[in-house]
């Protein structure tokens, strides 16, 4: 799924088509199909194989700096069921015109941005947006660690 978001006069708008994407837009890809990857490739000149790299479940966190883009991969926490925790890679591309996120599944880390709950979030402030995503990732990890700690304490008390 490919969605395009952009701040206009302080309001976050979701554009209906990728053709509406303009400078300062955020392109969010969730489990993209080959056609969506090709569209993003045409818009940004990011090679398709690099876009696909972010979809590799074994991809480790790293940063790549190229002439036309910066590619950041971070592992984000995922809760599967009531007590099964995992981490999946989230790829973030920063180009001159666009901010692109790509993940195999819906990322809880991005919900506050998609629902416009972050008061200081703007799609065109790409560095700030990157740091805000990293901060939200840390907050989620801490929340999940606290849940694990509470469950561990409960189990230890029962023993």
Where are these regions (language model features)?
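Peripheral, non-transmembrane regulatory/ligand-interaction domains of membrane transport proteins
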Residues: 1-159
């Amino acid at each position: 799924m490919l969605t395009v978001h952009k701040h206009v006069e302080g309001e976050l708008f979701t554009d209906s088509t990728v053709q509406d994407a303009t400078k300062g837009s955020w392109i969010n890809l969730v489990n993209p199909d080959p056609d969506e990857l090709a569209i993003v490739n045409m818009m940004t000149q990011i090679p398709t194989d690099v876009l696909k790299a972010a979809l590799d479940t074994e991809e480790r966190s790293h940063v790549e700096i190229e002439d036309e883009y910066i590619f950041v991969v971070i592992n984000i926490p995922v809760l599967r069921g009531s007590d099964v925790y995992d981490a999946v890679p989230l790829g973030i591309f920063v180009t001159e015109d666009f901010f692109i996120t790509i993940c195999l599944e819906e990322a809880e880390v991005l919900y506050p941005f998609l629902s416009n709950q972050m008061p200081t979030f703007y799609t065109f402030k790409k560095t700030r947006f990157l740091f805000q995503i990293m901060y939200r990732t840390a907050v989620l990890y801490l929340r999940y660690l606290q849940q694990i700690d509470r469950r561990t304490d409960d189990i230890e008390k029962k023993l």
